[in-house]
Amino acid sequence: MIFINKGTKHFFYKKKLYIFNVIKFSKFNKFYLNFIINKILLICYSKGKGFQGVVKRWNFKTKDKSHGNSLSYRTLGSTGQCQDPGRVFKKKKMPGRMGNKKFSLFVNIFFRKKNYFFLKKILPGVKNDILLGKIL
């Protein structure tokens, strides 16, 4: 295990190098220890943002704030046709929960020492989040 002081950690932070400590190896093979690992697959979850409207979730335009729109300028508008289909089609962009989705990223390892990985990539999720990494 290596110890990193705050100055070194700040240097890596400025260079956008992220430090990961491997907590647990799942079915880790000793075969990988003899070779240089250049790529890993990271599986992580994005930040959850809760229930959001269509303006934030799907980048819809807002209506006029004046001319009679006092409360409904951030609403969806029309969702479907008239009597002919009589329903709203599937995959319609509507309000709902945003974020907390699973992401898979292929990341090149910048530097590896013992059980620390230094990666140069912007990763989704919150700080101190647990990521799942698969060696390729």
UniProtKB/Swiss-Prot annotation:
Q: Which residues carry this modification: N5-methylglutamine?
A: 83
Q: What are the UniProt keywords, alphabetically? A: Methylation, Ribonucleoprotein, Ribosomal protein, RNA-binding, rRNA-binding
- RNA-binding listed as a keyword: yes
Q: What SUPFAM superfamilies has UniProt attached to this entry? A: Translation proteins
Q: How is it modified after translation?
A: Methylated by PrmB.
* Highest rank taxon of the organism: Bacteria
| Gene Ontology CC terms, in alphabetical order | ribonucleoprotein complex; ribosome
The UniProt GO MF terms for this protein read: rRNA binding; structural constituent of ribosome
Subunit record text: Part of the 50S ribosomal subunit. Forms a cluster with proteins L14 and L19.
Q: What does this protein do?
A: One of the primary rRNA binding proteins, it binds directly near the 3'-end of the 23S rRNA, where it nucleates assembly of the 50S subunit.
Q: What family, per the record?
A: Belongs to the universal ribosomal protein uL3 family.
Show the PANTHER family listed in the entry.
50S RIBOSOMAL PROTEIN L3, LARGE RIBOSOMAL SUBUNIT PROTEIN UL3M
What is the protein name stated in its UniProt record?
Large ribosomal subunit protein uL3
What phylogenetic lineage does the species belong to? Bacteria, Pseudomonadati, Pseudomonadota, Gammaproteobacteria, Oceanospirillales
